[in-house]
Amino acid sequence: MLSGRRLDLLDPSPFDVEIEDIAHGLARVARWNGQTIGKHIFSVAQHTLLVDAIARRQTGGIDERLALAILLHDAPEFVIGDMITPFKAVIGDSYKIVEQRLQGAIHLRFGLPPTLPDDVRRIVKAADSGAAFLEATRLAGFAIDEALGFFGPRPALPEAVERDFLTPWPAETAEERFLAQFVALTKR
């Protein structure tokens, strides 16, 4: 990692996790295997901020711990990449085990339980699916009917929010905005 930490992917320690490494990595990992429109990739860091905006809209507001869980919901991808769902299914449990271990270490590092409660996971999943719908139809060339079948209904967001979050940012912008959201949530 750029911080100098060495993270054991098979036995990750919360002590080897730094938010700067997560932000840097996620800002450079492409969603949709990079198959999106725009001058820049649509990064996992930008995706997590879109998921946050959707969750806030869907729930009428969320507390800081839930918002932190949302921000970090794809954090393991800073070191293992964003593998597309069909390929995850082919690889099976081995990938899930590594991902869950990393997620647990990341959560512990930032004061969250290793495994999120079911109600929190449902909120994250609903907002994540909504983000996938918007990304698929606005950035990745999916037809609306096709996206409905995969991701469920389109979430309601103000046009200005959609325009901001669905215009791929440069990696530096995604990293800065991800870190700014982390600081706002943790008061660090």
Give the positions of each predicted feature:
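Metal-dependent phosphohydrolase cores
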Residues: M1-R188
